[in-house]
Regions:
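Active-site beta->alpha loop and helix N-cap motifs at the rims of alpha/beta catalytic domains
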Residues: 30-50, 54-56, 63
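Alpha/beta catalytic cores of nucleotide-metabolism and tRNA/nucleoside-modifying enzymes
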Residues: 36, 81, 125-156, 161-302
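Active-site-adjacent beta->alpha loops and helix N-cap segments on the catalytic face
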Residues: 10-24, 41-45, 61-85, 91-99, ...
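Long, charged amphipathic helices and adjacent flexible linkers at domain junctions
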Residues: 12-36, 76, 281-293, 297
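Catalytic cores of alpha/beta
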Residues: 42-49, 92-110, 160-175
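Hydrophobic faces of well-ordered beta-strands that scaffold small-molecule active sites
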Residues: 6, 31-37, 57-59, 86-89, ...
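Short, small-residue-biased leader/transition segments that mark boundaries at the very start
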Residues: 2-9
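Solvent-exposed alpha-helices and their adjacent loops that cap or buttress functional pockets
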Residues: 23-30, 49-51, 78-81, 99-102, ...
Length: 302
């Protein structure tokens, strides 16, 4: 038979794959992409997103424990069966997780009010500490798996301030993390880089802020004049390129895992020992009782 060329591999492609061995690609060698949907116009939005090439969908809402999410998931299953992966959330307890898992969610997001630009707890008084919510939901996930044989991954959404918080969330049971402020700081973020008081910053705002006006994520109906903000419009300190920063963050996560004697996330969750610490313990965990050199720029050698 006549031989035909199947594909062409360029040096640049090989170098890119070698430099980024963990990249997630589809069968056409495109990056996997997720898209958010709401529980209002999903019947028009979801087909359009899938036609555009979205690989996974997630119902984007501040409150996932609702019949609206159940109806949205049911519609997706009716139209596409199990061929379309769709996550749901957000929830903060066992009941919320079990509700979405039984509804057919492929993964569940955990966290209400813990995001850096979210003020849902301040304005409505609902939410829960991220660690408490995550531990309870992950226990419910394991309970559901033992009872049904179906494993529904959990995403920790919110509360990540320092890199070690990523490792803590994974150790508490999260299968993966959602990061907003972390990525908003980088060149790749589509927002503007501006100078504020001599420091470069990147714009960052919540979907519930007046600027975004994404009331479909939060609104329960009623007159528009009754809508109120559940997010803020803010700046985050500019941090340079995504590649360099993610590499450092991943190195820190791996280093902590090694300290725990773990070579994988499941092993970390098995071996990590979580303990409650006091405020003084947190202070003593950093530098203290010294004057940092970078805080005293005008040093004269005597």
């Amino acid at each position: 038979s006549r031989r035909q060329r199947q594909m062409c591999i360029r040096d640049r492609d090989y170098a890119s794959h070698k430099e980024n061995p963990l990249e997630l690609l589809d069968d056409q060698k495109r990056y996997l992409v997720g898209a958010g949907v709401n529980t209002r116009d999903y019947q028009e939005r979801i087909p359009a997103l899938l036609a555009a090439g979205a690989d996974v969908l997630c119902i984007d809402s501040s409150e996932g424990y609702s019949c609206w999410q159940e109806k949205t998931i049911a519609w997706v299953r009716e139209q596409y069966g199990d061929s379309v992966k769709i996550g749901a959330g957000n929830v903060v307890d066992r009941d919320g997780f079990l509700f979405l898992a039984k509804a057919g969610a492929d993964f569940v997001k955990v966290g209400i009010g813990g995001g850096s630009i979210c003020i849902t707890r301040e304005t409505k008084g609902i939410g829960r500490g991220q660690a408490t919510a995550l531990i309870e939901v992950c226990a419910a996930r394991d309970e559901y798996y033992r009872a049904t044989g179906v494993y529904v991954p959990v995403c920790s959404d919110g509360g990540i301030v320092y890199d070690y918080h990523m490792t803590l969330a994974l150790a508490m049971g999260a299968d993966f993390l959602m990061l907003g402020r972390y990525f908003a700081r980088f060149d790749e973020s589509p927002t503007a880089k501006v100078m504020v008081n001599g420091v470069y910053m990147k714009e960052y705002w919540g979907e519930g802020s007046n600027r975004a006006r994404n009331w479909q994520r939060y609104d329960l109906g009623g007159a528009g004049k009754l809508s109120f903000e559940e997010g803020v419009d803010s700046f985050v300190t500019y941090a340079g390129s995504l590649h360099d920063n993610v590499e450092i963050s991943l190195y820190k996560v791996k280093s902590t895992m090694c300290n725990c004697g773990a070579l994988s996330i499941p092993e970390l969750q098995q071996k990590a020992k979580l303990t409650v610490v006091s405020s003084p313990s947190i202070v003593e965990g950093g530098s203290h009782d010294v004057v940092l050199k970078n805080a005293t720029p005008n040093i004269i050698n005597g």
